[in-house]
Amino acid sequence: MNIREAKQQIKNAMIAYFTKDEFGNYLLPPERQRPVFLLGAPGIGKTAIMEQIAQELEVGFVSYSMTHHTRQSALGLPFIATKTYDGVEYQVSEYTMSEIIASVYEAMEATGRREGILFLDEINCVSETLTPAMLQFLQYKIFGRHAVPDGWIVVTAGNPPEYNRTAHDFDIATWDRLKRIEVEPDYDVWREFAVSAEVHPAVITYLDIERSHFYAVEATPDGASFVTARGWDDLSAMIKLYEAQGLTVDELLVEQYVQNGEIAKRFAMYYDLFTKYRSDYQIDRILDGSADAGLAERAAAAPFDERVAVMGLIVDATVSCLREAVMEEKAAAFGHSVLADLKERLAAEGVAENADASALIRATTTELARTRDTERAASLLSDERYRSFERIIGLLDEVLRTGADTPEGATFNLLRERFNERLDELDAAIDTAADALDNVFKFVEEAFGEGQEMLMLVTDLSVSRAGMAFINDHGCDRYFAHNQNLQFYERGHDLAARIDRITLEEE
């Protein structure tokens, strides 16, 4: 199966394992909750989907790479303890708590979440001295004498032997105690992630043209030659940083991530051509509706590779614009909930809205910062939620600073006034994003009509979480018209239904 199907299968298993009866007991007892074994080639996103599942289910998450562990760190250190059996004292061997099990308890204390996922990567690549202990762990969820706490589900991952010389197979008795999920690289599925995650458009459009270069592993006289999804994703992030700093992106950089000489060389050549298209086509002016009159004609007459690159640039700029608006909208919704809670607390303490509320505002700021840091340390903080925390904490800090210079102090009225100013800025940003979306459709209509380029635009907006969130909340007549024409209406409607709606209820 592909990585998206694997994620859904694992998520379904987690939901089932976490299900309790009316007395708070797990319907499937922990001893019968089979650990999941995710088997797949390196760099296809196994670890990433586990972090996503933990965030989506709002449970704890602890991750370990087992190749870094010795028998002592996994099992704990031995020590001599005194026990009494039938009135006779004996000295027996005991073990300190495993570092891995201890990390689970530490995560529970830090986050307050009693349920979670313990993810052990490269489980089939452990040293020979640790192998018996790992097999025991997979069967009984015990390291030494210490078990994984109830409510924590074990998920493991590993590479097939053809990708890792140190990987070894399990016997039938072990496999019969695991939920085995095999994952294969799939470019179409990865592309949906890439569009939504704003992977650099040069990477996406290059792979649209050279799909066989998405994932390749081969043996050469000089060693392994390979390129993986992780490599493309990491290269994308580095290209963005290089561009922001005005640094040169060349073959020397590319081959550090794309460890296949021929593919690295071809992508570096394509990137040079891509940057020329970016300069020529004035993408920002397409979004604001001020592009030169002849630009659409040039795009229509361009060869295939150029049209793919141009559409990649347009989609990337559009999704980035919509994502910015959606993230600010979610931050505003989060801020609204914080203000509503603060208002209730002020009323409960008898503090008027025009009275100094510095103490409570400061306490709220501290609580928010603590929650943010806790979620971040536990790998449970998404980019959207992080921005939401930063926006409201920044607003509260601003009000405290302003209030310190006024006789009235930091009042709730001042806080509401500043928040409403942010809402006005948000409305302007939403209008700008809506205009940009409309302008993009106008340009693609003029240049390509109902051709493959329009199909690419509609499809990529449909798989973009930010794109569908924005369209779902604010509409786009041209999107729905072309979506219906291209027989994607039902798919788009289904995707839209899965997006959390954002509503800002003003006082």
Model-found features: residue ranges?
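AAA+ P-loop NTPase catalytic core and its hallmark functional loops
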Residues: M1-S212, V217
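Exposed alpha-helical structural elements
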Residues: E5, Q9, S103, V189, ...
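Extended hydrophobic/Leu-rich segments
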Residues: A6, M97-Y105, A299, T364, ...
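Generic hydrophobic, helix-prone segments enriched in Leu/Val/Ile
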Residues: I10, I100-V104, Y242, F419, ...
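Amphipathic alpha-helical interaction segments
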Residues: S103, E198, F214, K240, ...
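Alpha-helical lid/collar subdomain of P-loop NTPases
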Residues: S196-A359
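Terminal-proximal interaction/regulatory segments of ATP-powered molecular machines
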Residues: A300-E507
